[in-house]
């Protein structure tokens, strides 16, 4: 999957339908994924259908990132580093997330 080609699609979707509509679509896709998880747990759908719903959420999350890429990436790195620290994979303490957000503002 080429990120440049995907970014072109994400930009076109946001330009065509607007950020507010795409946030709404993200909420809708997350709801469908939640329902699919419950159906999968009760063996009402196959794994491929569950993965399909996850992909829909992933596409929408990529659009959410596209709208706020710098802040999104900063917070993502913070969260991954926090997990890394909890797992004992690093001794570096996590920086304060509020400082990350203040640097953005």
Regions found by a protein language model. Name each.
Residues 1-105:
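Flexible "arm" and connector segments at domain edges
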